[in-house]
Amino acid sequence: GAHPISPYIYSLSSKFGHLADKDRNEIKEQLDPSASGGMNGYISLCGGDPSPLVFRSPVDGLEDIMDNQVICSIYKRSRSSQLRNGKVSRRRAPASGAARVLRREGAEREGCSDTRCRCRRRRRRVQGYGVAGLASCDAPHDPDAPHGTDAPHTPDAPYGSDSPATGNHYGYQYHYRPGGGASGGPCSPMIISTCTVYVPRS
C-alpha cells in the first residue's frame, strides 16, 4: 500500500506545484505525527513532478522505469524532536554482559593520580624501543606475577649502544587489563602504552 505521507505530498504538489523552483523551495508543510506514521518535521516539494510515470534510467544501457510507483519529496527536521502523543520513553539500560566493569584495584599503590581511573595498572621496565608485544592470557593468574614472556623484566639494563654516556634509557609499559585477574576469571587482551624515561647517572 501507499505510505501514509503520500497524500500530504500530492496535496502540497497540487497547491504549489505551479510555482517556480526558487519559490517552491520556500514552501514547507508540517507533518501530523498521528497521520504520517510517527514522523515529525516538514515536507517540501522537489523540482519537477514528484511522481513521474516514466523514470529515466541514470545508467547508460539500463531500461527506463515505465510504470513508476515512487513519490519524492524533501524532508526537513523540526527544531525540537518529540515523541508521539501517548508515547512513553523507556529508560536506557545496559545489555546483560555487553560490557565489563573496569576495576580500580592497585591504582593508588601504582601511583595513578587520575581519580577517574577505573583500571588496574601494572608497570614493568623492559629493554628496547617501542612496544614489545601484546601480552594476554586465557587462564586465571596472579596480578603481581610476570605477565607473559614477550617482554623480559630487565630492571637495570640500558637500551644499548645508542644510549647517551650521561645516563640510561628505560622503557615502561603500562598494562590496562579489564576485569579478570584477582577475581579468578580469565583476563582480556591488555591495552599497552609505552613511554621512555631518561635516568641520569649519579
From Swiss-Prot:
It comes from the Eukaryota. InterPro entries: Xrn1_helical (IPR041412). Residues 137-166 are annotated as: Disordered. Disulfide bonds: none annotated. Contains several arginine residues in close proximity which may be involved in protein RNA interactions. This is Cold-regulated protein 2. It comes from Hordeum vulgare.
